Amino acid sequence: MLSNIIPLSIGAALGATARWLLNLAVPASIPPATGNLFANWIGAFLIGIFAETVNHPQWKLLLITGFLGSLTTLSGFSLETVTLLQLNRPASALANIFLHTAGSLLLTWLGLKIGAAVK
């Protein structure tokens, strides 16, 4: 059990730190939700690559469950979307939903293709 918790925890700490740093790196002139969008897109792309190339169970725990699970954020996406709706900005909320969903699906597909080619 501990042999699984350690890589999972390391990955989670690194993923959460990466998301925080990514949000800090987004310039103030860009809408605040952009950091989470980038995190979700990066995570979607990387999960495609990792799904094709990572076979060892502990590396999967570290990279996919830990790192990408902490890097990406459904809860942040949900809060951003609901906040836009509460601010009576339905077009922005729909754009947020589309960008996160369509972008993530496209990037996961691309990651799978690249991962399969590299494998």
Swiss-Prot record:
Protein name, entry field: Fluoride-specific ion channel FluC
Entry keywords, A to Z: Cell inner membrane, Cell membrane, Ion channel, Ion transport, Membrane, Metal-binding, Sodium, Transmembrane, Transmembrane helix, Transport
Protein location: Cell inner membrane
Species of provenance: Neisseria meningitidis serogroup B (strain ATCC BAA-335 / MC58)
Reactions listed under catalytic activity: fluoride(in) = fluoride(out)
Gene Ontology cellular component terms for the protein in this record: plasma membrane
Family listed: Belongs to the fluoride channel Fluc/FEX (TC 1.A.43) family.
Positions annotated to bind Na(+): G69, T72
PANTHER family reported for this sequence: FLUORIDE EXPORT PROTEIN 1-RELATED
